[in-house]
Design a protein with these regions (language model features):
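Active-site entrance/lid segments in N-terminal catalytic domains of soluble metabolic enzymes
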Residues: 1-124, 136-139, 148-151
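A beta-strand-loop signature enriched in Asp, Gly, Thr, and Trp
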Residues: 119-172
């Protein structure tokens, strides 16, 4: 289950719990997406399905998220979308790892690790695996290519598994 961590821990914990009950085998915590990236193709095609209420059912069906709403999404879709858009932007720190461990029994994978020191710190904190990723360059399209960071991340990770996913030709 890939978690885009909301500001409210209660919402995150509810999503994680539901993922466990649904049979997911790992928690992938996305670190490389605080805001939506600059995507020229999406802008040209007005491709933002979330702004029309699509692909948000995990949130709209979540009892804790619904508790943030004054009316159910079926009655006030725009307010539900606005609430969804406003719950992100909280940057996780290493101090949040114990909370994540408490929130799940699943293995934890940190997605967005692109520096050897971060891989080493993740291993030291008992993280189960890391994704060397810049979200395909779609979120941080001005950053260093993850492929260039991969050897250092692998070295820093030691025996911890390292996964890789990112744009190779273009993030846009």
């Amino acid at each position: 289950f890939q978690l885009y961590t909301p500001k409210q821990r209660e919402v995150a914990e509810s999503l994680i719990s539901r993922a466990e009950k649904a049979g997911y085998k790992a928690l992938v915590v996305t670190l490389d997406t605080w805001v939506t990236g600059w995507r020229p193709r999406d802008l040209t095609g007005a491709n933002f399905p979330q702004l029309r209420g699509h692909v948000l059912e995990n949130y709209f069906s979540d009892p804790v998220f619904r508790g943030l709403l004054q009316k159910p999404p079926q009655e006030d879709l725009q307010s539900a979308i606005f609430t969804w858009a406003s719950i992100f932007g909280e940057v996780l720190t290493w101090d949040d790892i114990p909370w994540l461990r408490e929130a799940t029994k699943m293995p934890i994978v940190l997605k967005g690790i692109c520096h050897p020191d971060d891989a080493r710190k993740a291993a030291d904190l008992g993280i189960d695996a890391v994704y060397c990723s810049n979200h395909g360059g779609r979120q941080a399209n001005g950053g260093i290519a993850a492929i260039d960071m991969l050897p250092g991340v692998v070295e820093g990770a030691g025996d911890m598994p390292v996964l890789f996913d990112s744009g190779v030709r273009s993030g846009t």
